[in-house]
């Protein structure tokens, strides 16, 4: 399954790692470059550094092809 996760906090990171281990195609959008770089080493998937509400960032993560979209940020604006 092609999954996009916005937010690599505790829950988003855990889900990304577990879903990647189960061989799902995982893309994570994270605004914090350091957190994104750490996650990139932990999953077999794509990490996009950027704003999850930006059309350009969503396009870079291939949102049009995703089957499941999980918004797991603490910022709802």
Question: How should each PLM-predicted stretch be described?
Answer:
Residues 1-77:
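Cytosolic regulatory regions of ion transport systems
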